[in-house]
Curated annotation (Swiss-Prot):
HAMAP family: Tryptophanase. This is Tryptophanase. PROSITE patterns: BETA_ELIM_LYASE. The keyword Lyase applies. The modification N6-(pyridoxal phosphate)lysine is found at K270. Belongs to the beta-eliminating lyase family. Keywords: Lyase, Pyridoxal phosphate, Tryptophan catabolism. It comes from the Bacteria.
Amino acid sequence: MENFKHLPEPFRIRVIEPVKRTTRAYRDEAILKAGMNLFLLDSEDIFIDLLTDSGTGAVTQDMQAAMLRGDEAYSGSRSYYALANAVKEIFGYEYTIPTHQGRGAEQIYIPVLIKKREQEKGLDRNKMVVFSNYFFDTTQGHSQLNGATVRNVYIKEAFDTDVDHDFKGNFDLEKLEQGILEVGANNVPYIVCTITCNSAGGQPVSLANMKAMYQIARKYDIPVIMDSARFAENAYFIQQREAEYKDWTIEQITYESYKYADALAMSAKKDAMVPMGGLLCFKDNSMEDVYNECRTLCVVQEGFPTYGGLEGGAMERLAVGLRDGMRQDWLAYRISQIEYLVQGLEKIGVVCQQPGGHAAFVDAGKLLPHIPAEQFPAQALACELYKVAGIRSVEIGSLLLGRDPKTGQQLPCPAELLRLTIPRATYTQTHMDFIIEAFKRVKENAKNIKGLDFTYEPKVLRHFTARLKEI
């Protein structure tokens, strides 16, 4: 299918879900009842749901069929071994623990690694710092709940929507090593490499940067955890943008990437395409003691280590989804859909982050310059977009970043972004055109959009359940 300007979706739609159309008055009332928080809206009141791509997309026919093979044995399920074999084949990792989703893995490995560093290296919990190219919100939350200070060490181009860079998700390697030396390597229990880097706009990390980061980690004997929700999209960007790997397959790039970490934690609801599921996996016997301790915690918090909160059919589906999510034509279509949306928005004067994976990221700070960061311009924009068109999106800015747990002050956010997250194989190009038209209407009324303030503010992960009002 070469030399066509636009290729259609590379799949056939067999099952559909009807959606409800609502009026502007209905939506105005709904968002007020939800406390200006789109997480608190009912899904039936959403026309196009761009809140997340996590477990919200379609599954393939092979994934659905695989569920019929499910072995529901409490322990030693053959479905577990199907999943563990898929992990070994794709990532090269020897030890696998299934979890119900990514945060299930986080609540297990984070306290174990902190305890190990404390026992073996004399970690001082009052000085404990963990590093990432940018922590996902729940990874940050679990780290803080366990007493760690989080530091995101990203390159200067990462959040600059006026600058293009092939790998905006990269670590600032100099800042990483300086930070380790500043706090003392013994006080750093782990480094997290997030691929793709969600908070920077679904931006990829290059293989060269992964290698260099891992060399620094080895130098100071710090374990590296690959936050792997969008591993396949990251591999696709490496193939397309890093010349050394242009002739490599997605499978080859993925396998190579995971040489530069010691463990992986995954929300499988993204690139593995399942509606529920997660993984915690360890590369080899150098992490066997951590693996054994995590297995013990898994029994208490998730379930027996050969099911981890997942039914047998779900593990079979995940084993297939890991492979299906790496298809070359699928990834090319998915990334081109994001590019189409970003290009359409920029044509009408809506500034966006350079197209990455899984979402278009609108620069709300530039669209609403009259709203200061402490009044959450991206959240205000999200509310207006819902009122205008029934589209649910999500703020990636000051509201999500939250407060310094020690001082209570709002943490400075590098950019106020609105994420338009595209669920897999769910929306067509016509939907993208509708989103662009909706933004045209929002832009026309931008100067009248008001900032927001709290009426209820949770102390941790506040963006999920906070309630706000217009100022």
